[in-house]
Amino acid sequence: MEADPSLVSYADQHGEWETREISIFGVVKSFISQLSIGQELTKVSMPSIFLMPYSILELAASRHLKYIHLLISAQHEEDPLKRMAIIIQYFFSCVRDGNFQKKPYNALLGEVHKCFVKYPSYDGQSTSTAQFIGEQVTHHPPLTAFNITTSEGITLDCNVQFSAKFHMNSVSVVTTGAVKICIPVKVGNQIIKETYIIDKGLPDALVKNVIFGTRSIYWTDSVDIMCEDSKTSATVHFDKNEYVKGEVSVYNTELEVEEHRASLKGYISDVVNIDYLESKSSEAAPASSASKKEKKKEKKKAKHSKHTCSPSDTILMDTKQLEPNSTLYPKQTDPITSLGTWKEVTKQIVAGDMQAADQIKKEIEDEQRKRLQITKEEEKKERAYFKYNDDKEIWEFKSTQTLAPVSNSTSSTASDAASGSN
């Protein structure tokens, strides 16, 4: 896969548009006057001054690819308890870099976003790749489905839906939709596939002072992570000032009880510590059938420096040790793409011309409404890259072996590709 150097996403960058002051006069005053307390913001067309210069699909890609290489260590960790710690570390890395001070664009129905990252392999002898494919599969409610596949055979699948409600000078953000991570783990001479379910892609949050004062975000939720294959689970609680605490448990089949095996606490913006506890039986020891000779051989394997920030016996995550990946973008060939459709809106927001951005965005929204009335596209249960599973009630990624073209009445122009409200 080759990168197109001309393509860039502002979801990977920081700029003054993130903290730009909002004037309460003009279009903003008119917009606020139309809102009621508790109103759902994903169903209204928001002025560009409230928007980040990128789509929700771009945000999902940036968030989940930036530290995807952290998961590679789980393949080489023989202790199931510490494998769970690696999953938690990766989840924290996805949360910590979030920015909810403004809202990304609602993705267009049928909008596609593709990108990838390259990083050193675990032993540093080659280069690995992780590819992201995301698609907006429904419009009401707005639902995003995406898949990440790595060279090592790790996959990440997610159906995620965000809702944001207005509360005068604050906005509450609620996330629904689980994340499924599948990892082929090397245990001795065997490869065992483990599946981890994170019950929410992000914790719920409260964004304060969205109009007056200094904007800040407070996480207000707990998240559960489960792995039936290794009989491990974790519950993580989020609090203000990015403080987290939680515990990791292992189900002891010998005693038929769930044992509390580790506690964690700290700040996801700095350091999160972990404290491992002793098991009540020998059964919960590391799930390894490798001989001492094999273990010594494994220890001698030189890790690449990018993979040396795995959780230690006392530190779950030290943000100063994390090395982010740089996102690359292939040539965009799909009819509706995040980087193509919103290009001019993004350009005007970054330049600070909100009037021009609002006008272009309105044209996009108007064209989308016309298209949906004609095509009835919202009723479809199959998109270009995802298909709805009625039994599981989720949108599933069509693997590269089964991808088939789906008739799409949408024009390749940005206006015909337009979505509803943002």
Curated annotation (Swiss-Prot):
Signal peptide stretch: none
Q: Name one GO cellular component term.
A: membrane
Q: Where is the composition biased (Low complexity)?
A: 407-422
User: Which domain of life, per UniProt?
Assistant: Eukaryota
Q: Where is this region: Disordered?
A: 283-313, 402-422
Coiled coil location: 354-384
Task: Name the UniProt key words of this record, in alphabetical order.
Answer: Coiled coil
Q: Which InterPro entries does this one have?
A: OSBP_sf, Oxysterol-bd
Name the residues that span the membrane.
Answer: none
Query: Molecular function (GO) terms listed?
Result: sterol binding
Residue spans of biased composition, Basic residues class: 293-307
- Family stated for the protein in its record: Belongs to the OSBP family.
Note the PANTHER family from the entry. OXYSTEROL-BINDING PROTEIN 7, OXYSTEROL-BINDING PROTEIN-RELATED
User: Could you identify this protein by its name?
Assistant: Oxysterol-binding protein 7
Name its species. Answer: Dictyostelium discoideum
Query: Gene encoding this chain?
Result: osbG
